[in-house]
């Protein structure tokens, strides 16, 4: 309609619409130019011109020229028609908003006012327009919309003359509305409305013309008008809803009408307008909506105002303004959509629509007045929302049909259309659009509407009868909108039906849709196809409404099994769904209220009952399971819409209802289960009491509620008790609060008393508490229960029976005191819960002197800071304290040196992980334990025992070790010197221990075995070696400890240098992480991580993977296990810089194989040991110069960076950067010079002073070390400079290797040790950073092989080794070349961390004035953390750890990176 007028053209094809648009060409959709620029006055004047003459004329002409005008009406008239009737109606009504457009009908209104009065009949139409566009669609669309809409929206559709009439009318409207540019602007100018109305009236035959018919016509015209005068068409919204459901479409009977723009402009163009016509019999409703909303603002008083005034106001209203348009939007109304439409809109509309149809021609004014109260605008708005295009087209089509059909038929058809539309809505709309001009707005939608219209046409007669009741009933709108509602059952149905007979339901549905245009199928639209099918299949669905009742369901299943099947696959589902569908459809069709009554039986409550009754089960026993769930689900929806009201009211009746204890919902007496929560109906009070459960109390309450007066329902059941904790009311039988589980006051207190007594609290205040807190007074509720006690910690009041605070679980003060032997607190707990006693300090409580926290009497330690109670003696040992207790519990003591005799301590301190305890992992303390047998069971971290010695030399006499079998323990950094109580100082961080043990066995005090971080430990190697020889201990993961037992299975000794004697050849290599187990026997290499095992005699000694320590073979005991920055100077004694980080340890003893610096990080270990003095195992930056000469045979098994120079060919433990010259079994970076395998010397620079026996071991992967030593290149010495002449540094990172003989062994010269370059001329597997004299396969710094290594500068033709600077400037290493290769510990100025060179670029801790200061000619202390110059020596001999000692500091320029701020 709007499309017709506005180019949207009534349903005329787009052409008409366009023509009309051309007509309206001057008038733009929101033409503010002409109409609005005209101004209200001009508009009003124009309106006045057309009002009386045009409007009245049209009014008469409508009746006279129903056909001719109907086209006009179609174009503008349908909308004006609506305006007339609607305007009259709406003018009086609040719906005048539509009339706003119709306002031109004020004059018409005068004429049509009777019509408007008839609109009173039309009031429903008015309602329909605004709220019941659906209803109007249902009725009017079917009735008058067919007539009016057809002409206007699609003249071709019902009214052939309408087609031309529409054009004609458009012209009329246009001509008349030429003046009515206002209407153009507003979309429906009041004049246009008048003209249209007049035409509409003409179009609408008096009988056909009902306010609805006219409205439908007017709706179409409104659309036409909208087309004519573009305006925001709310109908678009309504149309959408139409697509959603016919109810929506019906609601948006004036889909073409835009709540925003009274003009013809609608979304979807002509199609939208057509949809409006089709959708609703009240085509004007769409326009009315537009105008009406505007009018409603201005026009509510129009009923009283004169037609002229009305027109003027309407003209003003019609002017589309954002506000007016916004008001027209049905968004808010959309929700009212259902209720108003369903109730007043549909119900009233159906009945009133008929009346209006009859009366509409008669005084519309009266009806207008009636409609005013209607919240139609809202409803209209709602309708608008529902569907955009479809509603307009449907409206028009429906209007045409409606005109043809009786008003009742129209209504029923519109309902059907609604249903169909919900199912078919868009297709139907589209069909009308295609068929008639009305489809011009939305061709597709129009066509579908026509189809619907066709469907509607047969249906209208049936629907008329049924719909009269149904429309008034909510169920009708519900049926439209209930589609979603029914969809509940439908979804269920669809789910279950597929199994039973989904095919049947679909065909039936189709048939029903086509065949059963009758009212019953109409409702089916809400539910999916299934419902529709059943509705058609089962006309007796009305009877079926009882289906909701289980019995009813059974009947349907039995009688209408096929129909039911159609509805839902499951028999039960089918039964439920079918009955619901039947009931809903037929009942809504027959009478809107009838379904509700039937639904009463079939209501959700009933459904819920049915499971209880089992009659539904009876219906389909097999299907029951499925049915139960689906039925329950389905029925509630049905009952909710139709019968819930009645049944709910009944349920409220005391006699006929019982209250669910669970959800407090009133259920019917017949319901065995709560309809809401499905809780079973509770037996009577007696039964419940017998049951003894909480349920009886609930049932009692409901019983009392129903039985007693209204107030009694709110009275607590007799015997109920309020929880004094959470104030929740509990049933009499409840012993505990259901919410907080607090015991019932009477019982709880008694329990508390008993408990209190039972609890051993000496002071039983509970006895006094025994008094039950039974006082019933109100204040008593707030009184603390007798015997309750307040938690001194969190101040929560606890019951007497509680032994612990419910909140913080603190023990009850009395109980605690009883346990603690301080009974006083008990009285406190039992006593002063209420008074100021709360603030009294509990007896026996004590304040912590440290943190002032109040502690319970029984607490021996402060709960906050764990400080010992002032009076008590704290067993807790401080971190650095030494515990002298022999049996000190091995409680993972961190830094405590326990000075207890090692033997007793060892025996007693087993099993516990003492962190710093002497027995366990002593971090910075030296534990002197005489030989203690049991000592190592605990995970002693730094304990000298065999327990997991990290960087500590473990010096335990073999006998002792045998006795102890301490190996088990995981000594992290301790050296286990069992014999010597003080043997290995566990994990000495910065301490330099210069204790020389004359005897290897008596290493006890001198061996700072435990993880001496930066300490230089000078211990005589003898003690450790002797100790080691006999026993196998050290099975336990000695991390950095130096295990001196010959057999010592140094299990993962991290950095301990284990000087093991030849005595125990069976040394088990237990993964000593940094520990060097130097056992004379070919001890299996224990992965000594940083430890160097130096075994003088045992060529076979396999060094466990010594990680980064350089074991000086001079002294069998490298005690400074993991000595960080300590330079350990132990000549004869086993200097054990185990894991000496940057310790430079000159060890004078060659004979003693004990690798001293186990895992010397930056430690420079100088061991003169001839026999492959264990080179610093895993000496990180440590440069160890060992003079040990028997390196040749050492097979460094995977020693990481250690260069092993031991005469024996012990299995070399994977030395990372160590170069094992001789048979070095894949020492990673190890250059194994000596038969002794070096334990993974990480960056330590092992300097085999005199080890010439082997070809110069290429120092394996010396990170920043310059290895100038010929023989042994430090195995992966990180920053250490290896001065061994022969060492071809294998993969020396920043080190310059001067040793030419670096076999390309990956790390070792012979075996593919990682960073080890083997001096042997034999081609070695390419060592990663090692330089192989024979072949330089990625060899670092090997003179023979020139491939440039990354940072290595080889003075010879060697390719620059990675970090090595032979002659070229290594990265951080300072060589003679001084080429900066950034050798980390190199003495070169290039970024020398610990470089000796004065130009130490970034020399970290190196003392570098002398390039060879590290005792290595190459002087490239590549990242030698502890070169001889104090490099990073924490506790080193007077060397400042972090100060680069030497002029290098002065020479070095460090630029701090400064972030530039933009």
UniProtKB/Swiss-Prot annotation:
Residue(s) of cross-link: Glycyl lysine isopeptide (Lys-Gly) (interchain with G-Cter in SUMO2): 354
Major location (coarse): nucleus
GO biological process, one term: nucleocytoplasmic transport
InterPro entries documented for this protein: Nucleoporin, Nup153_N, Retro-transposon_transp_CS, Znf_RanBP2, Znf_RanBP2_sf
Zinc finger (RanBP2-type): 653-683, 717-746, 785-814, 842-871
Residue ranges of Sequence repeats: 237-238, 648-649, 710-711, 778-779, 894-895, 915-916, 950-951, 972-973, 989-990, 1013-1014, 1073-1074, 1107-1108, 1124-1125, 1161-1162, 1200-1201, 1216-1217, 1228-1229, 1263-1264, 1276-1277, 1278-1279, 1293-1294, 1306-1307, 1314-1315, 1328-1329, 1350-1351, 1362-1363, 1371-1372, 1384-1385, 1404-1405
Compartments, record wording: Nucleus; Nucleus membrane; Nucleus, Nuclear pore complex; Nucleus, Nucleoplasm
This protein's record includes keyword Cytoplasm: no
Binding site for Zn(2+) 2: 723, 726, 737, 740
Molecular function GO terms recorded: identical protein binding; molecular condensate scaffold activity; protein-membrane adaptor activity; structural constituent of nuclear pore; zinc ion binding
Subunit composition and interactions: Part of the nuclear pore complex (NPC). Interacts with TPR (via coiled coil region); the interaction is direct and provides a link between the core structure and the TPR-containing nuclear basket of the nuclear pore complex (NPC). Interacts with HIKESHI. Interacts with SENP2. Interacts with XPO5. Interacts with RAN; the interaction occurs in a GTP- and GDP-independent manner. Interacts with MCM3AP; this interaction is required for MCM3AP localization at the nuclear pore complex. Interacts with MAPK1.
Family assignment from sequence similarity: Belongs to the NUP153 family.
Domain notes: Contains FG repeats. FG repeats are interaction sites for karyopherins (importins, exportins) and form probably an affinity gradient, guiding the transport proteins unidirectionally with their cargo through the NPC. FG repeat regions are highly flexible and lack ordered secondary structure. The overall conservation of FG repeats regarding exact sequence, spacing, and repeat unit length is limited.
Protein name: Nuclear pore complex protein Nup153
